[in-house]
């Protein structure tokens, strides 16, 4: 018999249900979590034994959305779900980031978390539900995991924090912040904001952490009722004698190496020290494991860097804790792009371009929550040469997708609306050098490139990465961290914004015990760094260019009667296709009659506008037009009068005398003046050549051909 164990609780305006014991009973743990009809099924499987020689923690998080959850059938030839979308990849990272630090050091058994969205309420985003499910499943599994964690989304509407706002509420929110943490401390923050202050952002983090305690309590209660026994896992005993021997050989040399400011030179020296130390020790004792020795050396490296920072000594590259690396800012570096910038901060460099396109270039995204169109695209590329390595080049990896999304969040708050600037904008950041915080360099470069392209951004934005070293109550916050400081420190804290406030905040914390005070210090220090960078950027370009690039399409907007849209499009799109070919422009028509004509040449755009105005012009009864005969029938002729419209000239209206045969007076393609006699209810037009000729004596009336005289 299936005996599900269920916990139900109120979480803000939503009801959350945790259920286990019903499905996937061969998995290490499985939980179905639902929040007001959005349901995510999360499983965890952990291997009891680690693979021989395993020297890292192989945690995999897969998040997958099934279209049946929204009552849809997938598109595409195969009619089934394929590779993860960008959105699914971002949510998988969102789950991974707060749970990864909670596994004990030295635990290298393979663990896989799979979250499957099986039902979706369009107003309730599945990401928070999936995070709660992953926390519950890991806590139930018995795997050594120092959780559970809670997760909350925080909005800011009418100067009030809102817990887990609906999709509709988020449209009017100045903040979209996701926070996850344990009972004692915050572990992860991901957010975008409309230039809120440091205090407002910190308040949101604290609010979200306080509110999610009910999630942690209910998961703990579920574990008491249905949890599996804790695995009897113990870290390997520390070999103090070996640690001391390695330290004696390498510590002072590593300390000297970490005073080398050039990254590549430092890495080369550290590699030499490590390989020589391992070779010496293995020569003394062949039973020693090179991987174990490598881990000891890494711990020594970490201690060298951290102890120096905590003692108030200069950092790896000689800077003080709040110093920013040297900046070099250039715009307009590529001649044919619409906008470009090269932003260099120390050994981190981003070549960023901005490209303008039409509404047709916008990305149509079909998500589980519904369809949407994105007219601001941000792509981040991290080639292997940026860190002096060789490697695969191809489709973007999870990290590139995540960094691109963070950089996009940083810029989004200052972008103009589609009504203010009717272009699709694509920003591409090519990381050409990397030694820490390439995503924040991308924010700075994007701001510069957008201004260079003439995009009317509301303000310049800059980003900075902060780090933390903490031992006991002693802590130091570092500004503009290097890659090594990120790797060896306790926190990665990225802040982007303008002079007026924060547009994006991302925080990943590797230890427990990060207090509100520490976050306050980090935010305030980040503000000073951000303002310094903005000052340097403003020396290069302090406002958007007055005009867009000569190579960018210029969009001209006109309005037509919505009833005339069908005339401009034509049967099967024939008229609009002919127009685009004739004028060399791109033409887009919206349902409300807004017509956007895009062209790199102003004359071509004006030609297209004139032609559209001709097509959509109302036919005036009594007006005389110049027409062209398009068709001849027994009872008259059809004459085109411009704008794709034609009318009938009845045989009685061709001449002021009796006409026996139409072809005696008119030929195909002949140009004739015509007067509009009537437009009936069905839009049919009655024309007269006879009356047009009478009113305009100078117009040549068609005459019957004179019969040839026989010789």
Curated annotation (Swiss-Prot):
Comp. bias regions, Low complexity: 699-711
S1 motif domain location: 622-690
One of the Pfam families matching this protein, by short name: RNase_PH
Example of a GO MF term: RNA binding
A Gene Ontology term for the protein's cellular component: cytosol
Similarity comment: family membership: Belongs to the polyribonucleotide nucleotidyltransferase family.
Protein known as: Polyribonucleotide nucleotidyltransferase
Originating species: Klebsiella pneumoniae (strain 342)
Species lineage: Bacteria, Pseudomonadati, Pseudomonadota, Gammaproteobacteria, Enterobacterales
Gene of this entry: pnp
